[in-house]
């Protein structure tokens, strides 16, 4: 299986997503998208990606899978459901605050590996059992 990064533009939460719409349109051939999965940095970006895909009459997850990466499940549209990677935000905050209050001399660099959880929200296909 080959992975390819095909979209490197930065999309801010407040800006229109015309760049992404143009990108998607450029990857359509005979009504099909040439990619089958989109990984989004946040669930809010996943929400806008899913809206763009639906405007193009693409089915999620049958035609293209979408996954977010923060665990926010609802953004105002009642039909919004997205598969996501839930991050342990409280633990991330606790560790970060602890690091900020350390004395500079004791602030050795450490790597923290925190557990995340996959939550199926209907925008990814589930593997066969």
Label for each model-derived stretch:
Residues 1-129:
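Bacterial carbohydrate/catabolite-sensing allosteric modules
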């Amino acid at each position: 299986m080959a992975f390819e990064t095909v979209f490197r533009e930065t999309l801010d939460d407040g800006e229109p997503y015309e760049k992404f719409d143009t990108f998607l349109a450029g990857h359509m051939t005979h009504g099909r998208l040439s990619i089958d999965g989109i990984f989004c940095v946040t669930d809010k970006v996943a929400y806008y990606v899913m809206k763009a895909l639906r405007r193009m009459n693409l089915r999620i997850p049958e035609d293209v899978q979408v996954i977010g990466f923060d665990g926010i499940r609802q953004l105002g549209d009642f039909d919004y459901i997205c598969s996501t990677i839930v991050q342990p935000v409280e633990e991330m905050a606790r560790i970060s605050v602890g690091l900020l209050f350390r004395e500079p001399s004791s602030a050795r660099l450490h790597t923290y590996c925190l557990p995340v959880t996959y939550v199926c929200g209907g925008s990814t296909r589930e593997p066969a059992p």
